[in-house]
Curated annotation (Swiss-Prot):
Entry protein name: DNA polymerase sliding clamp
GO MF assignments: DNA binding; DNA polymerase processivity factor activity
InterPro entries cross-referenced by the UniProt entry: DNA_clamp_sf (IPR046938), Pr_cel_nuc_antig (IPR000730), Pr_cel_nuc_antig_C (IPR022649), Pr_cel_nuc_antig_N (IPR022648)
Complex and partners: Homotrimer. The subunits circularize to form a toroid; DNA passes through its center. Replication factor C (RFC) is required to load the toroid on the DNA.
Keyword terms of this UniProt record: DNA replication, DNA-binding
Similarity comment: family membership: Belongs to the PCNA family.
GO biological process, one term: leading strand elongation
Purpose of the protein: Sliding clamp subunit that acts as a moving platform for DNA processing. Responsible for tethering the catalytic subunit of DNA polymerase and other proteins to DNA during high-speed replication.
Domain of life: Archaea
Organism: Cenarchaeum symbiosum (strain A)
């Protein structure tokens, strides 16, 4: 068999698929000897997710030739949700274009692969002026605090700290996080920067990955896309790009 990947538990794969499901209904994965990658953009081209999962993250990994396989995310999600936390999950591709999913020692599923309609999506090439690293639990709470009153998050970064704010019809919210705050793991500001981003996109991706990620890094500049990196122990890279809100 040309391709087979086995996880030691189910949490990482669930986090990846949950993150992808916030943006797209169909996903095309690329498997090589180095690992599995995915890159996709939502239909409105507001958000992009880029995932790299190295072979070293798997309990067992085999890929003797490059392969692309496309799946419907809702179908894939239903199956991997049947796995308990400690269950291993093995995915492989059969000769008759089926994705084989083995869960634990006694569950076996097959789903039909779909034709890939994905095109190569380049990553934004941006030089950022502000970089913030926070505990994921703290960032998720901040987003929830702002979403109580607003659909958008405004981030203002200064060398001394960061303000997360939002404004809506019902009121306003502002959360200040100083550079020496326990939740602030790192702060680098070349230039004071401000950006406003949709919580409709940002909140679901943070919730999806949050449980598996210890920290989150946000990079932005004035009126530039937000770049979010999740640090997950067994996953090489999850990057999320979100276009800024443009004031009319």
């Amino acid at each position: 068999m040309a391709f087979s990947a086995k996880t030691s538990g189910s949490d990482d794969l669930k986090a990846i698929i949950s993150a992808i499901s916030t943006l797209v209904e169909e996903a095309t994965f690329v498997a090589t000897a180095e690992g599995i990658t995915f890159r996709g953009m939502d239909p409105s081209h507001v958000a992009l997710i880029d995932i790299s999962w190295p072979n070293s993250a798997f309990e067992k990994y085999e890929c003797d030739s490059n392969i692309k396989f496309g799946v419907r995310i809702d179908e894939f999600t239903k199956l991997i949700k049947r796995a308990d936390k400690k269950d291993s999950i093995t995915i492989s591709v059969s000769k008759d274009s089926m994705l084989l999913i083995d869960i634990g020692s006694n569950k076996k599923y097959k789903i039909r692969l779909i034709e890939s309609s994905a095109t190569d999506t380049p990553l934004p090439k941006i030089s950022y002026d502000a970089k913030i690293e926070l505990a994921t639990t703290s960032f998720e709470k901040i987003l929830g605090d702002v979403q109580v009153v607003s659909d958008y998050l405004t981030i203002k970064a200064k060398p001394t700290g960061v303000e997360f704010a939002g404004k809506g019809d019902s009121g306003e919210a502002a959360i200040d996080v100083k550079k020496d705050d326990d939740s602030m793991e790192a702060l680098k500001v070349k230039k004071e920067s401000e950006g406003t981003y949709s919580l409709e996109y940002l909140n679901p991706i943070v919730r999806a990955v949050g449980g598996a990620a210890g920290s989150v890094t946000c990079e932005f500049s004035d009126a530039k896309p937000l770049r979010v990196e999740f640090k997950v122990a067994n996953i090489g890279r999850i990057h999320f790009y979100l276009a800024p809100r443009v004031s009319s």
